[in-house]
């Protein structure tokens, strides 16, 4: 269930072992976030199409536009692999959130990829940065994708804010090997044009005639936790307003919760671990395939 990287990896491995594999997905084409989340300037979509054709020729069945409820799985299968990702994005519930012009990042990214694939949308449904001052809230890869997409759509300016402090440019003594090195990452999207601001907490959205026109932010300070835990955030009282008529929320995703499944139901990818990297989703899908094979051969 789910034709993203985890589902495709699991399907491919199980098919190679001789099982009859059917992949269900709610979207109109396979790929998941590979197709609808990662911009075309980072991942050329014909690469996905070519791989899907190979998988179909090898015998894998794809049933698209199938929104399967994981609590009511389709009958007729010996095992199931839930690979539905992390569909719920983290929102920002501060005053003014209801204003027009504030969108979750994937609202824009998925729509842009569909437009480039030939789909059309009514004008009132378009999420476009053309001629606008864009503010991206969130400093991760999704935020970077919003920057590159906004620049390509013709934004007047793009600003990215992050609540965390700016990481060091080189090795961070706070994260020695073998920990994951927290250092400043500058992507090609940043290099194309973007202002980056750090240690800013969003207080409220400002509007005019029902549309967002700015964001009130406050400078924060981060101090070490004396007990050795996560750093402690402290407000400074220094408040400023950033002008914006398009705000994109790129603050990550919530880990999904699942009911207690039967023993023939397996979970893989972001659906199991929460939002992570594509390569980890692929590895998780392959492990799930191995576990399914072991279960079916007990």
Where are the regions that the model predicts?
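Residues forming the flavin
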Residues: 1-298
């Amino acid at each position: 269930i789910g034709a993203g990287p985890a589902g495709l990896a699991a399907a491919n491995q199980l098919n190679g072992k001789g099982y009859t594999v059917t992949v269900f997905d709610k979207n109109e084409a396979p790929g998941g976030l590979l197709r609808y989340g990662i911009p075309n300037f980072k991942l050329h979509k014909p690469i996905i199409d070519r791989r899907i054709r190979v998988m179909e020729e090898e015998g894998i069945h794809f049933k698209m536009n199938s929104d399967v409820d994981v609590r009511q799985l389709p009958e007729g299968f010996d095992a199931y692999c839930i690979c539905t990702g992390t569909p719920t994005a983290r929102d920002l519930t501060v005053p003014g959130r209801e204003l027009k012009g504030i969108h979750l990042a994937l609202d824009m990214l998925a729509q842009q990829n569909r437009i480039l694939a030939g789909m059309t949308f009514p004008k009132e449904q378009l999420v476009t940065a053309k001629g606008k001052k864009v503010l991206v809230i969130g400093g991760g890869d999704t935020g970077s994708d919003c920057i590159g997409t906004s620049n390509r759509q013709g934004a007047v300016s793009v600003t990215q804010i992050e609540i965390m402090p700016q990481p060091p440019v080189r090795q961070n003594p706070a994260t020695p090997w073998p920990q994951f090195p927290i250092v400043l990452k500058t992507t090609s999207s940043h290099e194309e044009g973007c202002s980056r601001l750090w240690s800013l907490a969003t207080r409220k959205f400002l509007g005019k005639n029902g549309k967002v026109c700015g964001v009130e932010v406050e400078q924060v300070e981060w101090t070490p936790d004396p007990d050795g835990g996560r750093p402690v955030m402290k407000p400074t009282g220094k408040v400023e307003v950033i002008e914006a008529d398009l705000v994109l929320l790129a603050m990550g995703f919530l880990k999904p919760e699942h009911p207690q499944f039967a023993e023939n139901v397996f979970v893989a990818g972001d659906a199991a671990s929460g939002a992570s990297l594509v390569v980890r989703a692929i590895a998780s899908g392959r492990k799930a395939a191995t576990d399914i094979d072991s279960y079916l051969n007990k």
